């Protein structure tokens, strides 16, 4: 059973308990897979649930992908559209298939510039440039409620950094999860 099949019927949940129902469903899924969230994963995921923008600068292998899964699940449960960005098409493709396994192929799409698969899906894996171009074209009115930016340290690259910077400036209504193992001090971003 994929994670989207576990989505609670939130119409039956009192508004004051919606976030709790979403969180309980997600943590039941992780526990069912034998995964206990690390403190940093839980803190970041709860920040996303609370509507915060989150910077997750933790080492390789510390579970950033699980926080991204939580973010996508939270957005999906709320009827929102989320985008996952990566710097290269091969990583986008890899993440697309991983997200299909977790959320079901009907809920996941991919946009790379070369190809678009299921482009109207609620969860989209895309290159950073795709999201930046959507942000430039549509601004705050873009059909993007949440952006998970992996490898966010690319923001400082002279040639491609714009693709990580533009969404932050133009997608003023979107929630962001910025992830990197090599970002360094993030206090200036907060």
Residue spans for each PLM region:
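Helicase-associated low-complexity/disordered flanking segments
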Residues: 1-55
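Walker A/P-loop NTP-binding motif
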Residues: 45-54, 63-80, 100, 165-170
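Loop/turn-to-beta-strand initiation segments
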Residues: 53, 80-82, 107, 120-123, ...
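The conserved Walker
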Residues: 58-60
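Conserved Walker A/P-loop ATP-binding site and its immediately adjacent core
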Residues: 65-66, 80-101, 130-133, 181-189
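Conserved helix/coil segment N-terminal to the catalytic DExD/H
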Residues: 112-145, 155-156, 161
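Post-DEXD/H (motif II) to motif III coupling segment of the RecA-like Helicase ATP-binding lobe
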Residues: 153-190
